[in-house]
Amino acid sequence: MRVKINLKCSECGSLNYLTSKNKQNHPEKIQVPKFCPKDRKVTLHVES
């Protein structure tokens, strides 16, 4: 079952991306480097 999740910037805290994941296959929180338009640089985004 796929669920929708938000990816939050770890530096400024803004919610920049909406994605989905399968909680049965990946129960841990997602952490991916993405571009933050507020900081105007690539930062680590974590699942919120």
From Swiss-Prot:
Keyword Cell membrane: no
Any one of the GO CC terms: ribosome
Presence of keyword Ribosomal protein: yes
Biological processes per GO annotation: translation
GO molecular function: structural constituent of ribosome
A family per Pfam: Ribosomal_L33
Keywords: Ribonucleoprotein, Ribosomal protein
InterPro entries, alphabetized: Ribosomal_bL33, Ribosomal_bL33_CS, Ribosomal_bL33_sf, Ribosomal_zn-bd
Superkingdom of source: Bacteria
Similarity section: Belongs to the bacterial ribosomal protein bL33 family.
Protein name in UniProt: Large ribosomal subunit protein bL33B
Organism per entry: Streptococcus thermophilus (strain ATCC BAA-250 / LMG 18311)
Gene: rpmG2
